[in-house]
Amino acid sequence: MKSCLLLFLIFSFLLSFSLAEQCGRQAGGALCPNGLCCSEFGWCGDTEAYCKQPGCQSQCGGTPPGPTGDLSGIISRSQFDDMLKHRNDNACPARGFYTYDAFINAAKSFPGFGTTGDTATRKKEIAAFFGQTSHETTGGWATAPDGPYSWGYCFKQEQNPSSNYCSPSAEWPCASGKSYYGRGPMQLSWNYNYGQCGRAIGSDLLNNPDLVSNDPVIAFKAAIWFWMTPQSPKPSCHAVIVGQWQPSDADRAAGRVPGYGVITNIINGGLECGRGQDARVADRIGFYQRYCNILGVNPGGNLDCYNQRSFASVNFFLDAAI
């Protein structure tokens, strides 16, 4: 009898570990394998209980996409080169770094990316991703050859950072001598983002942040991770562009409606949105429209965030209320 009780206790102990949450904020930002939805409680699946909005945290498309997540049918090598026409210019510090093969390889780790919805939706997501990341890495200027929107991906890391971007954190402690300034296509910043991203993609970015600016596949993975991962109260960029995000009454009251403009709000709304006409927002739109034209897809409406209150202001008021 005692031996049976002991076996039961051992089984229960092991079961508690096997049932640990699998994804989302409960698992350090991890994504579900094979494009499965991450439920609001941190579990992976493909039914409505996992994928319904609001609640679903990432990859909320329902039925998982194909097993490879290969985007070569959505964006060709020649289109990639045309979009990022001057990335290898001698004036660009990132010349030779960002390659088509690195992008395609990295995207395979995120099966929902660029594979959700119909062909037009998939192309819009790729155009939106490169539109936003091109602004973050642009080397263009108003009179640049081929126009300012042909100079995305000119940089791979922040120039002359004024901070080491280290925020005190027990969960994501900064490594000695390391700085967490902007790196890669999305200019990933701060130790807590490096920590969560590293856990999700299987690389120790807390101790090796330079991997994001030294390894092009990891650079793209870090950018796509940011794109696919919601950070409450913000939805993921992915959920917005594929039409999975449904704004709440509070979102609508703040002017946040589905469209490319909300993605700008997610990425840098605290500095760029709700200020009327803004050159930075216009720059993001210019890249996106050019890429939509190359990929042959309509960019849709609601492209700016000029009159949107930022998600950051939502955080502020919630904190003040608490």
Swiss-Prot record:
E.C. no: 3.2.1.14
Catalytic reaction equation(s): Random endo-hydrolysis of N-acetyl-beta-D-glucosaminide (1->4)-beta-linkages in chitin and chitodextrins
InterPro entries: Chitin-bd_1 (IPR001002), Chitin-binding_1_CS (IPR018371), Endochitinase-like_sf (IPR036861), Glyco_hydro_19 (IPR016283), Glyco_hydro_19_cat (IPR000726), Lysozyme-like_dom_sf (IPR023346)
Disulfide-bond pairs as recorded: C23-C38, C32-C44, C37-C51, C56-C60, C92-C154, C166-C174, C273-C305
PROSITE patterns found in the cross-reference section: CHIT_BIND_I_1 (PS00026), CHIT_BIND_I_2 (PS50941), CHITINASE_19_1 (PS00773), CHITINASE_19_2 (PS00774)
Domain of life: Eukaryota
Signal peptide start and end residues: 1-20
Induction (free text): In roots by wounding and ethephon.
Assigned keywords, A-Z: Carbohydrate metabolism, Chitin degradation, Chitin-binding, Disulfide bond, Glycosidase, Hydrolase, Polysaccharide degradation, Signal
Catalytic center residues: E136 (proton donor)
Every Chitin-binding type-1 domain range: 21-62
Pfam family, any one: Glyco_hydro_19
MF GO annotations: chitin binding; endochitinase activity
GO biological process, one term: chitin catabolic process
Tissue-level expression: High expression in roots, moderate in floral tissues and low in stems and leaves.
Family as reported in the entry's similarity comment: Belongs to the glycosyl hydrolase 19 family. Chitinase class I subfamily.
Protein name, entry field: Endochitinase CH25
Organism: Brassica napus (Rape)
